[in-house]
Each structure stands twice: as C-alpha cells, then as structure tokens.
C-alpha cells in the first residue's frame, strides 16, 4: 500500500472560496484596492489575489496579509498565526526539587 498522503495532496484541486474569488475578480476589473475580511483560513491563494490585501481572522483579530507572487499555492491561514510564542522560560526560573 504505502503512504500516499503527499501524492494525493498535490494532485487534488485547490480549495478556493467562491465568494472571495468573485470579490477579487470584481476588484481586478474595476482596479479597486480595499481590504477584504476573510474567516476562511483554508482557502488557497490564487494568481488573481496577487497585489491585494486580505485580512485573515486568527481567532481574536484580523491580520492584514499583502499577497505576493511567492504566496501562490499556499493557504491563507499560513500567514495569520493563531498562537504567540513568548519564548522559552529562563533556566533560573525553574524550581529544582531536592529529595
């Protein structure tokens, strides 16, 4: 059988939210540039989205993401982190138990 996870993922069609794509195409025709709010983090970035700013919801607030050509094929959620890394704790802060 074998592992086919990556093979299947590459050969599937990308998921693009139709509402978002329609808004982007309409804005491309009119030449308008405004921020679009998006809750759909699993939406794949397409060529039509390049040059637009999309505000992606991370669970608390909307993070503005400017779409560049290198981002095509990635998901919107990759650029809007849901967790903040505050660093590792200091070694001096650890409490060492002695028996």
Curated annotation (Swiss-Prot):
Keyword Ribosomal protein included in the entry's annotation: yes
Entry's Gene Ontology BP terms: ribosomal small subunit assembly; translation
GO molecular function per UniProt: rRNA binding; structural constituent of ribosome
PROSITE patterns: RIBOSOMAL_S19 (PS00323)
Cross-referenced Pfam families: Ribosomal_S19
Coiled-coil region(s): none
A cellular-component GO term for this protein: cytosolic small ribosomal subunit
Record's function text: Protein S19 forms a complex with S13 that binds strongly to the 16S ribosomal RNA.
Annotated protein name in UniProt: Small ribosomal subunit protein uS19
Classification of source organism: Bacteria, Pseudomonadati, Aquificota, Aquificia, Aquificales
């Amino acid at each position: 059988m074998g592992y086919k996870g990556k093979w299947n993922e590459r050969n599937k069609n990308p998921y693009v939210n139709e509402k978002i794509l329609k808004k982007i195409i309409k804005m491309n025709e009119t030449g308008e540039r405004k921020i679009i709010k998006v809750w759909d983090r699993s939406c794949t970035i397409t060529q039509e989205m390049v040059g637009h700013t999309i505000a992606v919801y991370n669970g608390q607030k909307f993070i503005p993401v400017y779409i560049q050509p290198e981002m095509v094929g990635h998901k919107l959620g990759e650029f809007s982190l849901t967790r903040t890394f505050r660093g590792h704790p200091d070694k001096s802060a650890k409490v060492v138990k002695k028996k």
